[in-house]
Amino acid sequence: MSLYRDSAVVLRVQKLGEADRIITLLTRRYGKVRAVAKGVRRTTSRFGARVEPFCHIDVQLYTGRTLDVITQVQTLDAFGAHIVDDYQRYTSACAVLETVDRLAAEEGEPVLRLYLLATGALRALAGRERDSSLVLDAFLLRAMSFAGWAPALDECARCNARGPHAAFNVAAGGAVCAECRPAGSVRPSAATLPLLEALLHGDWAVAEAATTPVRREGSGLIAAHLQWHMERQLRSLPLVERSEWKVPEIIRERAAELGATQDPVASPAGEDG
């Protein structure tokens, strides 16, 4: 059996038998890994709370036939301690973990950029220096960029004509010019697409200057764009405390075609039964 060590973020936990858990990790060098933490549900477990969702850990594992096994854990950052007592930050962090879990689909495939995005978002949420909705939206935009789904913001998604453009269409891929604008496109306020650009590129001065209505509208566009590409909504995203936004009708139609279902009560940061 070969031993290996890496830093990781705990994405999800699942009961296994009477005392064990399967821990889903996003590691720095090996991508997503599912491993068993033996005896972790016992009060005498040496792992304690170090393998709970939101934990950033240094972990040693040995390779098993089906699942790897966790042998040592050391806490690097206890992000959860600064997140779980704030509902908005907690639900935002749940959305971060669920997004990562969905995008890192293949186990054992390195996804360093996604790992850095996840740890950066959790660190920002735990630090409480920035608005949690802005942190989440910045993460979602950058995660979509990692996946190759970033919305066009400064040029037309169809003809590449330079903007600014007044319309946005998720099926087309983002901002669209007047000539290419499909039916059903939305017309966000003039400040909304610049806000999304600022979040994507880390211009926090511009992002934090945005008004509340602009932030809410931007959140709606980001969520709709993400849902279109993932083909079903994140379970945790409806729980994030933000004003309601209307899902474009084309998204509803796509969901109906796929027979998509959503469970707004379930949380990726909880323990699967």
Curated annotation (Swiss-Prot):
It comes from the Bacteria. GO terms for biological process: DNA recombination; double-strand break repair. InterPro entries: ARFGAP/RecO (IPR037278), DNA_rep/recomb_RecO_N (IPR022572), NA-bd_OB-fold (IPR012340), RecO (IPR003717), RecO_C (IPR042242). One of its GO terms (cellular component) is bacterial nucleoid. Keywords: DNA damage, DNA recombination, DNA repair. Belongs to the RecO family. Involved in DNA repair and RecF pathway recombination. This is DNA repair protein RecO.
